A protein has these predicted regions:
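Residue-level detector of conserved catalytic or cofactor/ligand-binding positions
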Residues: 477-486
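Glycine-enriched loop-and-adjacent helix/strand subsegments that border the catalytic/binding cleft
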Residues: 249-263, 268-345
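Bacterial Sec-dependent N-terminal signal peptides
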Residues: 1-23
Length: 486
């Protein structure tokens, strides 16, 4: 009898622990229209409803490490914390001087060295992993899936044609293309989609998927997860193993071999936010979540940062008429552009590709037709700042000296081009470049890079991103592309 009693007690305790392991946690937005339900069962999942209607079914999230453990499989919750925030944050050089940030958060602290944090804003749900591990480790893979209640229609940007082939060849791209609209089941499983992308959940409600706070971690691509799942699954570029200088005018570093993991983690850290913005088309356009979820500014005094328009000589191929000199990449032409900018109230003139010796990836070698100090001084007299174009590798290989040298000359900033990757090494470069430029009072315009993902909040000297299928493309594409969404 005693044995039966002990067995019954043990079974009761086991059931209690099992029920606890299967416990779900709900988190609602401040206004209550959005709700996420997080389940810590055999797998860690979350689902999202909007006004009580499912817009995202239970979707798994996990990180697999090089020691064989997987954060998110059989998670063991050690503690739960909740907070609510309603604050006003500064947002210089954004679309408003300040923003209201209001959200409710849920953090599940696991018995291992990690946590997962969820936030519910009125316009979206976001989550991120947090590592407390003090020893270095590698992330072999990340599971980021989005499973929808039905075969919804999606509007997505595939990696552009010309990068066809396996995913490895598609990891090298400029993140600019027109958008394709198709049912989730009809999306090409052999092609990567970059972010952001939108899924139409019906009744005027859209779900926009993106990420932010993307520092020192590979960017998220999505691909078709299979018709049975009505969803999308994440793909990440592995860390580069072997790089070779090449590409456009020898200004890029091309990945020839990759490692067997996507990220190398050396200290406790937070991981990028996975964001689902939910609402109408207007709500999506008005959302500030990418900015709000990023790390706060690391520049205390931003008074030196001056946004402005730029006169862009590359667009019309340096062609000007009715002048008494030969137009082109030379001092006289740039003085003409400076005069034009001063007359029209344009704050900057850019010296696009061609001012430095080509194919050398050396920004200290200026072509003989250019007297750069004279151009900079002339611009200062006219109240016009000078921005220099720089290929990524030429900029990165001598970053400190380049920034120091041209800052002392009076140059105001750089347009950095041809990154064309978003593996961990490249996203780390973006932050390193911004930090170095800030030390020398330089602004940055990043071209040929991934979507905006929080960098401009953390380093507000980054004034622009040019990763859209924009004006540049009109020089060589047929007019039919103008009617396609970009």
């Amino acid at each position: 009898m005693m044995r039966k009693t002990l067995l019954l007690l043990a079974a009761t305790v086991a059931c209690a622990f099992s029920a606890q392991a299967r416990k779900t946690y709900t988190l609602s937005s401040p206004e209550g229209r959005l709700q996420t339900t997080v389940a810590a069962d055999d797998a860690l999942t979350y689902a999202v409803t909007f006004d009580g209607r499912p817009v995202l079914d239970a979707s798994p999230l996990s990180l697999t490490l090089d020691d064989g453990t997987t954060w998110g499989v059989d998670p063991r919750v050690a503690g739960v914390s909740r907070t609510s925030v309603d604050a006003v944050i500064p947002s210089p050089f954004y679309r408003a001087d300040s923003l209201r940030e209001r959200y409710n958060s849920l953090t599940l602290r696991m018995k291992d060295d990690w946590s997962v944090e969820f936030r519910a804003y009125d316009d979206g749900i976001a989550y991120r992993f947090v590592s407390r591990a003090k020893k270095p480790f590698n992330v072999v893979s990340e599971q980021a899936e989005y499973r929808f209640p039905a075969d919804f229609e999606a509007t997505v940007p595939y990696v552009a044609r010309g990068n066809e082939g396996d995913f490895e060849s598609q990891f090298f791209n400029s993140f600019e293309n027109t958008y394709t609209t198709a049912r989730l089941s009809a999306l090409d499983p052999g092609r990567l989609m970059f972010l952001p992308l939108a899924v139409d959940a019906g009744d005027g409600v859209k779900v926009c998927i993106t990420e932010t706070d993307l520092e020192n971690y590979p960017g998220l691509y999505l691909t078709n997860a299979g018709a049975a799942k009505n969803g999308l699954k994440g793909v990440f570029a592995p860390c580069p193993e072997k790089l070779e200088q090449g590409g456009h005018n020898n200004l890029q570093m091309l990945v020839r071999e990759r490692k067997d993991h996507i990220a190398e983690i050396n200290a406790p850290r937070t991981f990028p936010w996975r964001v689902a913005i939910v609402g109408t088309d207007t709500d999506l356009a008005a959302s500030d979540l990418s900015f709000l979820l990023a790390a706060p500014s690391k520049i205390d005094d931003t008074s030196w940062i001056k946004p402005g328009k730029v006169a862009w000589e590359w667009w019309n191929d340096w062609n000007i008429s009715d002048v008494d000199f030969r137009a082109g990449i030379n001092t006289e032409t740039y003085k003409y552009y400076i005069d034009f900018a001063a007359e029209k109230g344009i704050e900057y003139v850019i010296l696009d590709e061609g001012w430095a010796v080509n194919k050398q990836a050396d920004l200290m070698q200026v072509v003989p037709e250019i007297d750069l100090p004279e151009i900079v001084n002339y611009g200062q007299q006219k109240g016009v700042g000078i921005i220099l174009w720089a290929g990524y590798w030429a900029f990165d290989r001598d970053l400190e000296n380049v920034c120091k040298h041209y800052s002392e000359m009076g140059v105001k900033g750089f347009k950095v081009d041809f990154m064309d990757r978003d593996d961990q090494q490249m996203t780390a470069f973006n932050y390193r470049a911004a930090a170095t430029a800030a030390r020398y009072g330089l602004i940055l315009d990043l071209h040929g890079t991934h979507k905006p993902a929080g960098l401009n909040r953390t380093w507000p000297n980054v004034l622009n991103f040019e990763g859209v299928h924009g004006l540049e493309q009109m020089k060589w594409l047929s007019l039919i592309h103008i009617s396609e969404p970009t």
